[in-house]
Amino acid sequence: MTDLHIVILAGPHDRINCPVTTVLEKNHKLDGIAWFKDEETGAWYPADAWTNDDKKTEIAMVFPELKVNQEIELGLDKNGPADKESLLKKKQVTVAKKSEKEYDIKINEESLTTLHVNDRNRPFLHPFIGPFGDPITRNYPMQIGIPGETKDHPHHTSIWTAYGEVNEVDHWSVEKMAGTQETKSVPVASSGVAVGRIVLLNEWKNKFGEFDITERREMRFFNLPRGHQTIDFTVTLKAVNDDVKFGDTKEGGLLSVRVATSMDGDKGGRIENCYGAIGERECWGKQAPWVDYSGNVKGNRVGFAMLEHPSSFRHPTYWHVRDYGLFSANPFGLKHFTKGKLNGDYTLKKGGSIEFVYRLIAHAGDATTAKIKEKYLDYICSPEIKEI
């Protein structure tokens, strides 16, 4: 054992399939899998550990179940259990570089998604495999000719980040003069027992190759079973060469999803938010901490819940969510969403940065059966990990 001891505090809620990350007070110089042991029961708890950008140790764990107010005291054991290799077999998130433009993400040897960079104007995740083993985002325009799929909006690339008016450059569409997001490097592409992590460093360029915005995008893919697949997104935009104006337009989403065509709201799908609003009419252009979009894929009810963290810029965000399948968080399009009552223009001063923080959950059923209300509490008031 070492001198690192932690306590897990569940808090006043039951927790099911709950990911937890925390930054420790000190830099313990841990990197990779860290094994924690409950000395009372002998149970082992694997975690992923790394040194973050602030030079502190960050750890991630996943808890299949915690009871109300449960406390678990754990100590770090650098050797781990004798049978750790068998315990870890198949139970990991793997991030594998497939090519210079593709990274495959698997959970317990089952495909989740593929990250594409420097392709189709901006990074995106496609395909995305849902709770029952079928893709639950639209395949067009990456794949053409799939029976029954809609073919509108070719800039809707499964799961992506984009915005339509950045210093008057269109970073949303794929029109002739549209901007691009060029991935300059991928400094982190790590596998783990609790989480797989990818960090992208992007430049948002105009058609002439000039840029005023740099982006750091971190994606965390948690080791959770199908029906509970969870990804955390942190998008940080920085003005590097001049002030940057984000103009007011509905055309954008700092996190965007195009759901599978069979899930569309006008094909029997269901859009709902945390306040009980249902459908495009009640949810489009409204503020809410989370929105859920569910529908049928090959006879199974599945959905996406998009949750915004309170630390995110202009929380709670407005939602650009449509019956035809678009699902995106847009904190700038206030003029459109409020029929001219408010203006969402925002100027980011040179050297300044803004951050957008979301969790995306792919689930079985609708928002009620997937317990998205409880999942939001897990996100914003997660169990605590404290050093003792």
Which positions does each model-derived feature cover?
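Active-site/ligand-binding surface loops and adjacent short beta/alpha elements
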Residues: 243-245, 249-318
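Terminal, non-catalytic protein-protein interaction segments that mediate quaternary/complex assembly
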Residues: 86-114, 130-132, 136-144, 211-218, ...
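Short, hydrophobic/aromatic-enriched beta-strand segments in well-ordered soluble domains
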Residues: 70-81, 109, 200-202, 217, ...
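Acidic, contiguous internal or C-terminal segments within carbohydrate-active enzymes
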Residues: 92-98, 189-192, 198-249
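Beta-strand-rich recognition/accessory modules
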Residues: 50-66, 307-388
